[in-house]
Curated annotation (Swiss-Prot):
Lineage, opening ranks: Bacteria, Pseudomonadati, Pseudomonadota, Alphaproteobacteria, Hyphomicrobiales
Alphabetized InterPro entries for the sequence: Conjugal_tfr_TraD_a-type
Family: Belongs to the TraD family.
Name of the gene: traD
Keywords recorded for this protein, A-Z: Conjugation, Plasmid
Name of the protein in question: Conjugal transfer protein TraD
Highest taxon in the source lineage: Bacteria
Length: 71
């Protein structure tokens, strides 16, 4: 049973990573360098700390982008 749980956890982790990669594509950043992408994410994480207005602003942008694809 432990192997089955490990396999399920691994599948879930893999699926999550694929979905996160899809967000990079959806944002139009597919061909950017990995260092730039990581920098954007780190900067975003820093901006979000304690700033609910920024969190709301970025969430609205994301909701709008998903809305255009029916997600």
């Amino acid at each position: 049973m432990s192997k089955a749980m490990t396999s399920d956890a691994r599948k879930k982790d893999t699926r999550e990573k694929i979905e996160l990669g899809g967000l990079i594509v959806k944002a139009g950043l597919r061909y950017e360098k990995r260092a730039l992408l990581l920098g954007l994410l780190i900067d975003g994480e820093r901006r979000l700390k304690g700033d609910e207005d920024e969190r709301s602003r970025l969430t609205a942008i994301g909701v709008e982008a998903f809305g255009h694809d029916g997600e």
